Amino acid sequence: MNPVKFYLLTDTHYFEESLGVEGKAFEDYMQKEQYFMKGSSAIIKSVFDRISKDTETNIVIIPGDLSKNGELESHKSFIKELYALKESGKKIFVITAGHDYGSAFAFKNDQWIDVEGTEFSALTDMYKDFGHGEALAFDEMTHSYMAQITENVRMLAICCDSENQPKGAMDDRLMAWAKEQLDKAKADNCSVFVICHYPIIPPVPVFDLVGDTKVKEWRKVATFLADNDVELVLTGHMHIQSINEFYSENGNRLIDVCTACLVGSPAKYRKITVDENAILNVETLDVGDFGGVPEGVDAQEYFDNQFRNSIVTRVTRALDGGKGIVKHLKKLGKKFVLTGKVGTLGRILFIRLDKSLKNKPIKDLIGEVGLAIFTGDMPYVEGTPVHTALCKVLKRFSFVIKKVEPKLQKGDVKTDLKEMLLNTVGNNKGYSDNNAEFQLKK
């Protein structure tokens, strides 16, 4: 791949605060939200200001979910920030995604309120100065485009989150259009990397079993890209830090660098460099203090506390509702999650746990493991107390797993649920999800 250097940030979820971020309904909503609505503008301004001062890196790429939920005023305010960044000398390339059009809302007087949203068709004109306005090719149906990034490098922006096709799908028509652009680039001796809002490769193994966490038919899409000389794809959507490799049956490799939400934990963005020797360097940068962190509070901890609490809230709210015995069991489960200790769970399952886990509240462990997965470089590898405990739990339920695995199988790819779960909580890939180097083809 030819040399190129740029900043990568995604899922900015800009929200225009004048629309309404107050009241009981807002506070209740934020209990389960990973990222900040109130403060998103300050976070983005802070990061853009930092990027604008880097005179050696002049390209900025943002693969989708630019606004909170398609609010027209949020788009207008975010575009002003993009223009300010562009005036500092940056070339900016964006794509839009599902949160950039459709139903929009805000909060006022303790209630949810509807606010003016944005039509998908309007996004073309709104963001024309940030990518597709000067594109070599533009697909009207999806807003995908091919752009000349440097003299010898092109970027294929695949938008598979449009209103004109199933979300997360790269259908045959779009694939044929992409193939045409890739063939033209090859004929012009240009390297190509891809951006797509949806991950191409599941960010963690267990996401292969979860819908809407990666493109549909991801192996087919990954094979198509790898076998058409694309080695690098940059993605978002899942608000997670991950780097994964895929090899096609022809032996061609695709690297998917998925980046977290900018305005919420883990609050990261990337600096990507491919040098003259085709060495890909992925560097992760912290959002850090943006001027809205309470005095005396560490910025990263401020972000992480919001995420940990949101994970626990989502788990406990899932235990609400039901009827009869189901409602009663859910109520007991919710109380156990909120007040129970890991050691008690171990005794119930007849498994021996490490001393470091016995007195840990269950809700704290849930928050810690969830945060670790989304931050990347998951620490619960072989030999750690959590890994050992999970192995014992999986062994205890092995009879259930054996019955479930065949039902989870997709095509010829067998499902090993134990390995999936262990490799989801522990990074066993041999490289970091945050800072890594790869040798690409020259």
Per-range role (PLM):
Residues 72, 76-177, 250, 271, ...:
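Extended active-site neighborhood of metal-dependent phosphoesterases/phosphodiesterases
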Residues 283-294:
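Short, solvent-exposed aromatic-acidic interface loops
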Residues 11, 60, 65, 78, ...:
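Divalent metal-coordination and catalytic microenvironments
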Residues 1-7, 16-18, 142-157, 187, ...:
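Beta-strand-turn-beta hairpins that frame and shape the catalytic cleft
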Residues 1, 294-442:
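Non-catalytic terminal accessory segments
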Residues 49, 53-59, 91, 154-156, ...:
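His/acidic metal-ligating clusters that form di-metal
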Residues 1-72:
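N-terminal active-site segment of His-dependent metallophosphoesterases
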Residues 13, 66-67, 98-101, 199, ...:
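Catalytic metal-binding/acid-base residues of hydrolase active sites
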